Amino acid sequence: MADFLGMMKQAAQLQSKMKEMQEQLDQVEVEGSAGGSMVTVRMTAKMELKAVSIDPSLMKPEEREVLEDLLVAAQNDARRKAEEAMQERMKALTGGLSIPGLGLG
């Protein structure tokens, strides 16, 4: 019974730490870029897009397809970095344990 109570206490502590970490993820920002930084995208580790910066030379009708491709690439780069930041914090929180459903594997 004591083991069960200990596990419940640990679960409650983990839940509290996870809530705190989720709040911290709102503050963590990453930047993705493409085309030699001609397009940059900034987002939080929770995948909320914060800003997009586009080099003025891409703002021409004939550059439309290039710009579209670079926007997608920069967003994907930022998303990958955000996922990595979130996983690093989750691993620190869980002590490297593999917990199903957390996407740490």
Swiss-Prot record:
GO cellular component, one term: bacterial nucleoid
Protein keywords: Cytoplasm, DNA-binding
Subcellular location(s) of the protein: Cytoplasm, Nucleoid
Highest taxon of source: Bacteria
Residue runs in coiled coils: none
Disulfide bridge positions per record: none
GO molecular function, one term: DNA binding
InterPro entries, per the entry: YbaB-like_sf, YbaB/EbfC
Task of the protein: Binds to DNA and alters its conformation. May be involved in regulation of gene expression, nucleoid organization and DNA protection.
HAMAP family: DNA_YbaB_EbfC
Similarity comment: family membership: Belongs to the YbaB/EbfC family.
Quaternary organization: Homodimer.
Descriptive protein name: Nucleoid-associated protein OCAR_7544/OCA5_c05960
Organism in which the protein naturally occurs: Afipia carboxidovorans (strain ATCC 49405 / DSM 1227 / KCTC 32145 / OM5)
